[in-house]
Amino acid sequence: MDLNKITSPSFLKNLNKKELEQVAQEIRTFLIEKCSVTGGHIGPNLGVVELTMMLHKMFDSPKDKFLWDVGHQAYVHKILTGRASQFDTLRQFKGLCGFPKRVESEHDEWETGHSSTSLSAAMGMAAARDIKKEHNYVIPIIGDGALTGGMALEALNHIGHAKTNMIVILNDNEMSIAPNVGALHSVLGRLRTAKEYSKAKEELESLINKIPVLGGKLASTAERLKDSLKYLVVSGVFFEELGFKYLGPIDGHDFEALEMTLSHAKKVKGPVLVHVITKKGKGYKPAEDDTIGNWHGTGPYKIENGAFVKSETKGPAWSSLIAETVRKIAHEDERIVTITPAMPVGSKLQGIQQDFPNRFFDVGIAEQHAATMAAGLATQNMKPFLAIYSTFLQRAYDQVLHDIARPNLNVFIGIDRAGLVGADGETHQGVFDIAFLRHIPNMTIMMPKDENEGQHMVKTAIEYDGGPIALRYPRGNGIGVPLDDELVALPIGSWEVLREGKDASILTFGTTIPMAMQAADMLAQQGIDIEVVNARFIKPMDKDMLHRILSNHKPILTIEEAVLKGGFGSGVLEFAHDHGYLNAIVDRMGIPDQYIEHGNVDQLLEEIHMTAEDAVARMQVLLQQKQQVGLNK
C-alpha cells in the first residue's frame, strides 16, 4: 500500500494477519530508506513495528491515550497517523519532529524527549479520566532502559498502590541506547527466560480452583503453593508485588500473540503490565547486529552495507577528545573514577571503560543517582568525572546544588552536548546549564575555544581542589588545531584577549568565538577596532579584565550559545552594576526566552538572529549609544 495515503490508523482494524505482515514489511522498508537520508532513531523504530500496529488495531486513538516514553520510537506511530508524507523532512528545520509533538497531531497525546516520564503522565491522565467519569484506555509504552529511571519506579509504586486502570506496555529490547545495566535488568532477564511461568501459573490456578473448599487450612495451603511457584520459577515477581497484573513475556513481533495478550489486558481491572520482547533494529541486519548502541540514533547511511555517511571534519569529536584526555590522565592518577548515566557510547567513554573497568560506572538512566554517587566518591578523596549531556544534567539539578556544591566537593562535571545540538530539537538543546549552574555557590564553569584548550581544561578540572568544576563542550568536532603534548592547568577565572581593539569589546567563549572574530573582521572594514576576548571561565569571571574594559568606557557585546536569562551576559551586567559602572553600555546576544526547535545549527542561529551580521548590527548600535551619552575617549 501507499503509506503516504494513510490518514488514520483505523484501516488496521480490518486487516488479517497476512495483510498486517505486508504492511509491517512496507513500513520497515520505508523507515530504512527515509532514515538513510535524514538520519534518525532507526534502531528503536524497526523494533516496534508490529507492536505499534497492534496497539492502533486494538485501541482507538486519540480517544485511547498512547504515551511513548522518550518518544524516539514513535516513527511508526507517526506513519500510521497520517504523517508518512512528511518523513523527507524528519528532524529537519521546520520539518517533522523526531519525537511526539502535540501540535503535529491529535494522536500525540504526550510530548517527550527525556526518559522515564510516561508512567507519571499516564497516572495523571488516568486520574483525570476517572475524576471526569470518562471511559478510555491509557497506555504508556516504556522501554526496559527507561524503566530503570527513578521517576518510572516512583510512578509504578503509585499506580500499583492506587489500583488505577492502566495498561503499561514494557517494550523490552534489552537496550536503552547502550546495553542496559542494573538489578532490574537482571530481573527482566529472568522473566524473559521464564516463558513457561505464565502457562504454569494458569494451569496451577485452574487446578486449585477445582479443589473442593475443605476449610481455611487447605485454602491457605493452596495460596502458599501458588506463591511458591512464583518464586521457584521467577526469583522475585517484581511487577505483581507492586500491584500489577503481569502478562508475558510475549514475542513483540508476533501479531497473534500481541492480539491475544492485548485483548486480555483490556479486560483486566486495575493496572496491568504487558511484557513484550522486541528486537531492536529488526529487519535491517546492520541494526540488528548492533550490540553497543551505534544504531540507536544515526546520521545518514548507505542502505546496502550500513556504512555511515561521514561529513567532512577538521578536528576530533569533542566527546572523544575529552574522554581520551581523561583516559590518559587516569593512567597516572588512580583517584579518577568515571560515571555515566547510560551514555558510554554517546560520550565516547569506551576506552575508559576498557582500561579501568573497576573505576568506571554506567549507572543506567539515573542522573540523580549518578550525581550523588559522584559526591560520595569525592568525600573519599577520589576524583569523580561525571560525564553527562547538558540536557540530562537538568534532571540532577538538586543533587548538584545540595549534594555536590553545598559541601564543596571536588567533582569534575563534563557537560557534553553543551549548546545547540540541532536535529534532536528542543528537548535536547544544551542551552540551560549555564543559567542553572551559575547561581550555585562554589561552582566553577568553563568552556574552551578549541580542542587544545579543551584538553588543558581537563587537566585543570582534575587538578582543581576548590570544589565542583564543570567543563562544557559541544556536540560535533573541533576545528583542527594542533594539540600540545604537555598539559597544564589554566589559572581559574582567567580570560585571554584573542584580538586587540580600542573601540569596543566582544566577550564570548566556546563555539561562538569564530562568529565574534568574523564580526570583528567585518567591523574592521568599516574602520571600527574591536577587541575579542575569550571569556573561557564563565564563573568565576576575570575581574581584572572586566575592570579594565569597563573603566575605559568600552561598549561590550556578550555572545553565548545559551539562554540569555541568567546566563553569562547577565553575569557581566551584574558585575557592572555591583562595581558602580552604572553607565556601562552592554548588549547581550544569546538564546531568547523560547524553546529552540530542531534543525541544522546554522539555520537555528540564523532564525534567532545569532550570526556575525547580527553581531555587527548590534555593535554599531552600541557605538551609537556611546556617542549619544558623551562618553567618547
Curated annotation (Swiss-Prot):
Query: Quick one: a GO cellular component term?
Result: cytosol
What positions does the entry give for thiamine diphosphate binding? H72, G113, H114, S115, G145, A146, N173, Y284, E367
Origin: domain of life: Bacteria
Per the record, what are the reactions this protein catalyses?
A: D-glyceraldehyde 3-phosphate + pyruvate + H(+) = 1-deoxy-D-xylulose 5-phosphate + CO2
In what pathway does it function?
Metabolic intermediate biosynthesis; 1-deoxy-D-xylulose 5-phosphate biosynthesis; 1-deoxy-D-xylulose 5-phosphate from D-glyceraldehyde 3-phosphate and pyruvate: step 1/1
User: Is Magnesium among the key words of this record?
Assistant: yes
GO annotation terms (biological process): 1-deoxy-D-xylulose 5-phosphate biosynthetic process; isopentenyl diphosphate biosynthetic process, methylerythritol 4-phosphate pathway; terpenoid biosynthetic process; thiamine biosynthetic process
User: What is its cofactor?
Assistant: Mg(2+); thiamine diphosphate
Q: Which residues bind Mg(2+)?
A: D144, N173
Query: Which Gene3D superfamilies has this protein been placed in?
Result: 3.40.50.920, 3.40.50.970
| PROSITE patterns recorded | TRANSKETOLASE_1, TRANSKETOLASE_2
- InterPro entries from the UniProt entry: Dxylulose-5-P_synthase, THDP-binding, Transketo_C/PFOR_II, Transketolase-like_Pyr-bd, Transketolase_BS, Transketolase_C, Transketolase_CS
Q: Provide this UniProt record's keywords sorted from A to Z.
A: Isoprene biosynthesis, Magnesium, Metal-binding, Thiamine biosynthesis, Thiamine pyrophosphate, Transferase
What is the UniProt remark on how the cofactor binds and its stoichiometry?
Answer: Binds 1 Mg(2+) ion per subunit. Binds 1 thiamine pyrophosphate per subunit.
Instruction: Give the enzyme class.
Output: transferase
Q: GO MF annotations for this entry?
A: 1-deoxy-D-xylulose-5-phosphate synthase activity; magnesium ion binding; thiamine pyrophosphate binding
- Protein EC: 2.2.1.7
List, alphabetically, the NCBIfam families matched.
dxs, PRK05444.2-2
Family, per entry: Belongs to the transketolase family. DXPS subfamily.
* Primary role: Catalyzes the acyloin condensation reaction between C atoms 2 and 3 of pyruvate and glyceraldehyde 3-phosphate to yield 1-deoxy-D-xylulose-5-phosphate (DXP).
SUBUNIT field: Homodimer.
This protein's name: 1-deoxy-D-xylulose-5-phosphate synthase
